[in-house]
C-alpha cells in the first residue's frame, strides 16, 4: 500500500514539475500584421454583402503572435533596436525582483504615491477647516470631506524607511539610510559630502 502511494506521489510530483516548467517559459507577443485591404475594383465585383465584426455585435479582438523569449524573437519584433528596452508597467510601479528590502517598504511606497495624489487638496481642506474667518458651514463641509478621506491619506503614516535594510527607526534623513549603514559607508568614504571625523 505504501509503495503504491509513494509511486503515485512520485508521478504527481513529476507531472507538477513539468507543468511548472511549461508555465515558467516566457513568451513575447505582438499584434498580428493587418491583412491587405482589397482594391476598389474587387469590392465592386463582389455582390455578397460583407458583414463586419462590429455589425455582428461581437467585440473585436486583436490577433497576437506569441513567440518564445529568445534573441531571434527580440530581433524579429525589433526590441533590440532603439529604444533598447521596453518599459513595462510593473517596472514603473517598482515591482522589480529583489528591489525592496521588505514588504513594508513597498507598502510605504504605495502610501507615498497616494499622498502625492491628494496631499495638496488635503492641505487646502485643513486650512479651510481651521480658518476662523470663514463661515461655519464652509468649515464644517471641509471637516466632513477630511473625515471621509481614505485611510492612508495622512502624511504621518509615511515612514521613509532605510532604503537598504527597511529599518524604520534611527534614520539619517538626507541620505535615507539607517544610522548603522550610514556609519559603515562613511567609514569607507562611500558617501558624498561625508568625511570621517578626525581630532
From Swiss-Prot:
Q: Which GO terms describe its molecular function?
A: structural constituent of ribosome
Q: Which residues cross the membrane?
A: none
Family annotation (SUPFAM superfamilies): Glucocorticoid receptor-like (DNA-binding domain) (SSF57716)
Entry's Gene Ontology BP terms: translation
Would you tell me the Gene Ontology cellular component terms? mitochondrial small ribosomal subunit
Sorted alphabetically, which Gene3D superfamilies does this protein's record hold?
A: 1.10.287.1480
Q: Tell me where in or outside the cell this protein is found.
A: Mitochondrion
Note down the stretches annotated as region Disordered. 28-67
Q: Which UniProt keywords apply?
A: Mitochondrion, Ribonucleoprotein, Ribosomal protein
The entry sums up its family as follows: Belongs to the universal ribosomal protein uS14 family.
Give the quaternary structure: Component of the mitochondrial ribosome small subunit (28S) which comprises a 12S rRNA and about 30 distinct proteins. Interacts with LIAT1.
Query: What is the recorded name of this protein?
Result: Small ribosomal subunit protein uS14m
Amino acid at each position: 500500500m505504501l509503495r503504491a502511494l509513494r509511486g503515485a506521489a512520485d508521478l504527481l510530483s513529476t507531472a507538477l514539475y513539468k507543468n511548472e516548467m511549461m508555465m515558467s517559459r516566457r513568451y513575447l507577443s505582438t499584434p498580428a500584421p493587418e491583412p491587405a485591404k482589397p482594391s476598389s475594383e474587387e469590392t465592386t465585383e463582389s455582390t455578397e454583402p460583407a458583414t463586419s465584426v462590429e455589425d455582428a455585435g461581437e467585440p473585436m479582438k486583436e490577433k497576437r503572435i506569441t513567440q518564445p523569449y529568445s534573441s531571434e524573437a527580440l530581433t524579429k519584433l525589433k526590441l533590440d533596436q532603439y529604444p533598447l528596452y521596453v518599459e513595462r508597467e510593473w517596472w514603473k510601479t517598482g515591482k522589480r525582483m529583489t528591489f525592496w528590502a521588505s514588504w513594508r517598504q513597498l507598502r510605504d511606497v504605495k502610501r507615498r504615491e497616494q499622498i502625492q495624489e491628494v496631499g495638496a487638496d488635503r492641505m487646502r481642506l485643513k486650512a479651510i477647516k481651521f480658518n476662523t474667518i470663514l463661515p461655519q458651514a464652509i468649515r464644517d463641509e471641509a471637516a466632513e470631506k477630511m473625515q471621509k478621506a481614505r485611510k492612508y491619506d495622512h502624511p504621518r503614516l509615511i515612514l521613509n524607511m532605510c532604503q537598504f535594510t527597511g529599518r524604520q527607526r534611527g534614520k539619517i534623513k538626507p541620505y535615507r539610510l539607517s544610522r548603522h549603514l550610514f556609519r559603515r559607508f562613511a567609514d569607507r568614504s562611500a558617501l558624498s559630502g561625508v568625511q570621517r571625523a578626525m581630532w
